[in-house]
């Protein structure tokens, strides 16, 4: 072969790579068609995975393309190439000892550290990834699969859980079928251990590892034996990744794994003299849970705590072990006061104490807890523990940072520390009971008047109402049915030393467990997501539960909203409804929810994310343009080289997993709030993220949402609608930070506010803006024998704040985020502004020791409330 000549395989891989990058440059907006481009990345992965040698060819071409990007300064192609390089290295079975691919990659990506954010941070993370792979081959694959399968070791207990939230009424049946396949039970722990061990030994020894022989010997091992071998292997890889010299680390790891193999009884299959054949070991399907979701709250996520309690319980117990020695002296000093408070619990029944002690002993012996014990334990504490009250935070209002030597003292525990944890649980519970009783004796009212919950045209009338005290103490929509199912160690108050995991921070612990929340829907669903996110923040601020164990990541998959027919849908097939435990909360199915003749919702939020991140537009937003039958097809089943290999998934499932695994940078979407005044004088505050419709457009949506009754009511257009006289006061923001207020009175049929996110030019603005669309009546003709007829004109104004007031208290309707369940009637005043986080939180830790020189005093600043949606590269400049 002549120098510079390429083989047919190299040409095919190069062509597939070019197709992946097609249309991602600065001129991508001029592309007239984009259907099918989302399959290019999936096609490239399928082509490369057919032969282990293809991965090295693709990596060479990615590096060559990356060097061209640096020479030409093509910013838009760097992030996709970096993601392709990362995913390809992750799936590469083995790098030959004489290969310098990773070293060349490190030199190539090191040159991009001078580029602006986020390009430099992407390359910095990629360099860290390359350094770990040079020292411990395959360690990133091991960490990913270990977390997704929930396989913990002594020093690494992090896990990753994926939750799919779909509304069966709005999502096509094919999507539900794919979600059902993803949520089916994955590989058993025995099979997962075998997969990880095969990958670890092949990544280290390469073709000199007899993979078939090793697979047979691993299958003959018991689960306990596999767990012991895997623990030693994982610990060896982690230790090797911390060695300074890469060559020394690889040699040490090779020697260590060979010793592990000899100890396990299969020395003949490792480091064989005769090289064999490499095998591609695909990434197993991640653990997924699928739920039917159409609420304004994320209370359903608490079920994950119940399902994952075996993994989460050691984590919280370890945190308490680090704090026991610090608390012993304080507990001994406070014994006199605690004895008086514990006397309050003595008035309870003896059965409650017995159930509590039996639960504590069962926790010490093992993670398996019977549901009867859980229920009795929670019922015994239900008088003193509440999950949504502001007063509950007093127990954990003051936090102290951990001592630096906390981890070193873990091995020197005293015998009585296990009992101290139970004692502190009694102590905290009795203190809450005393505080509650003292408040009831004093007769002090709750802080603040009750808020009027926004009425809904479609909300059920037979839903149970909350007690007045809860309605005043919490503005969320809790579901108390789930609490009795959670173990007591989850419902117990957080330790005052417990570090609360932030919702969004660049300094999060990489070893923490991750909860991926994947939501399917249109702009209507994005409104539900932001309301649920706001409620979750409020609840977790008052009483951390989910954020004690998980860092939350939100993923958004746009789908076209299916039109209803006006008649109830037929019962869902069996495959569309994932089986749930008999004691789990029941979720309504499509037949129960019914289908209304809804208008087709827009997908502006997903288009906005696509404009910020072209790789999101290509691989996530592009899925919406393909028919479901194409996305839900699978490849032809091929003979599996190894028994236990994962089955072929539909294309949509592969792309969803790709999105969840490699989208690591959030885009912050601004949230807006509206303060509504009703004709009765009551006020309420609601939030939205995409649109607010006012007047005739909201009333029309309400009529269409009424189902068959809409035919009787009739629907008129803006030309036949009765106009409203509205006073509109708006503010136009400027880059300088100054705002100019304008006041006008208009005769309108509709006033719509929407996020300015539809055009590429709007991304260049440094100020967040809303588009105010006015449907103004220029002239109204009212003939005696016919309906009134309006001559209308439309206009648009960019605003950041606006007040709309009905003249002479004229009422109008308001709809939030195109949601038929969030239509509010009889509104006379509407004020819209960006939503801010609470100024102060009682859960903030006490101030640290002042720095020297002391920082100048600054006033309290309120940060904007934003919804973080995960994308591949974040917002590109």
Curated annotation (Swiss-Prot):
Q: Where does the record place the region Interaction with beta-gamma G protein dimers?
A: 650-750
- Which terms does the UniProt entry file under GO BP? G protein-coupled receptor signaling pathway; phosphatidylinositol 3-kinase/protein kinase B signal transduction; positive regulation of MAP kinase activity; positive regulation of phosphatidylinositol 3-kinase/protein kinase B signal transduction
Phosphoserine found at: 456, 505
Compartment(s): Nucleus; Cytoplasm; Cell membrane
- Role description: Regulatory subunit of the PI3K gamma complex. Required for recruitment of the catalytic subunit to the plasma membrane via interaction with beta-gamma G protein dimers. Required for G protein-mediated activation of PIK3CG.
State whether it acts alone or in a complex, and with which partners, per the record: Heterodimer of a catalytic subunit (PIK3CG/p120) and a regulatory (PIK3R5a/p101) subunit. Interacts with beta-gamma G protein dimers.
Give the comment on domains. The heterodimerization region allows the binding to the catalytic subunit.
Name-wise, this protein is: Phosphoinositide 3-kinase regulatory subunit 5
